[in-house]
Swiss-Prot record:
Gene name linked to the record: RSRP1
Protein name according to UniProt: Arginine/serine-rich protein 1
Locations listed in the record: Nucleus
Source organism: Pongo abelii
Composition bias, Low complexity: 20-31
Positions of post-translational Phosphoserine modification: S12, S109, S111
Length: 311
């Protein structure tokens, strides 16, 4: 019994040499090795993850720094561009005011609004728009297309819808209708039944022209007919016009005579005019002869034009 107990005592040599104790020692060594390996693996994985996180954080920091730098650069560029644009606009404004004489009210800085930003994004400023409108062109929308106006001035614009440049004329029938409408409106406004028209608005019976120039009025009376088929009043007006034309021609002849005598006449009168004669061929007329010839030609034209129906 004692031997069995002594053999099984923890300090006995049998226990040291027993196979059970050797197996348990090997398993403990293996477990410690596996633990160390797993710990090293976990530490490695943790270090890898930490390195990844640190690299990501570094990338994020660098990206944020680069973004901030870009924003700062963009802001600086924006300010520099706006400054250069403002300087160029002021130069263009001064040049246009000096060259074309435009007032400063066309170039007032407008209020900051959506339209201003849109127009600037399209590459056009308010100065260009005001300059184009001042030159007679107009923008439609926010595009870059410029359409010239049909009429450059407001005086050329007709109040009617017709686009013809000839003035609008009324016929005699339309004038009579408008006169009757005006008479009715005036009578209604004044509360009377009849209105006496002034002499300038009274209608004159128009004579119908015939082959011989003699006309018959609408009421059957035969109007007075004189030279050129005109009435007495119209003939007096035509006679006044003829006298005015003759006086203008006489003034021109007198001025030309003075110029020839003083030597300040044109060069073709100094050199003379080549005239073709039927017998002697071409000959050169003296300046005085050419002047007399031109005067005779003018007077003959006046006589032929205005006095051929006098007889």
């Amino acid at each position: 019994m004692s031997t069995y107990v002594n053999d099984m005592w923890p300090g006995s040599p049998q226990e040291k040499d027993s196979p059970s104790t050797s197996r348990s020692g090997g398993s403990s060594r293996l477990s410690s090795r596996s633990r160390s390996r797993s710990f090293s693996r976990s530490s490695r994985s943790h270090s890898r993850v930490s390195s990844r996180f640190s690299s990501r954080s570094r990338c994020r920091r660098s990206r944020s720094r680069s973004r901030s730098r870009r924003r700062h650069q963009r802001k600086y560029r924006r300010y520099s561009r706006s400054y250069s644009r403002s300087r160029s606009r002021s130069r263009n404004r001064r040049y246009r005011e000096r060259r074309y004489g435009f007032s400063r009210r066309y170039y007032r800085s407008p209020s900051r609004s959506r339209s201003r930003s849109r127009s600037r994004s399209r590459g056009r400023s308010y100065c260009g728009r005001a300059y184009a409108i001042a030159r007679g062109q107009r923008y439609y929308g926010f595009g870059r297309t410029v359409y010239p106006e049909e009429h450059s001035r407001w005086r050329d614009r007709s109040r009617t819808r017709s686009r013809s440049r000839t003035p609008f004329r009324l016929s005699e029938k339309e004038r009579m209708e408008l006169l009757e409408i005006a008479k009715a409106n005036a009578a209604k406004a004044l509360g009377t039944t009849s209105i006496d028209l002034p002499a300038s608005l009274r209608t004159v019976p128009v004579a119908k022209e015939t082959s011989r120039g003699i006309g018959v009025s609408s009421n059957g009376a035969k109007p007075e007919v004189s030279i050129l088929g005109l009435s007495e009043q119209n003939f007096q007006k035509a006679n006044c016009q003829i006298m005015w034309v003759c006086s203008v021609l006489v003034d021109k002849v007198f001025i030309q005579t003075i110029r020839c005598l003083t030597g300040t006449c044109p060069s073709f009168l100094k050199r003379g005019i080549f005239m073709r004669d039927s017998t002697d061929g071409p000959k050169v007329m003296h300046r005085w002869e050419s002047f007399v010839y031109s005067c005779k030609y003018c007077l003959g034209y006046v006589k032929m034009r205005f006095f051929r129906h006098s007889n």
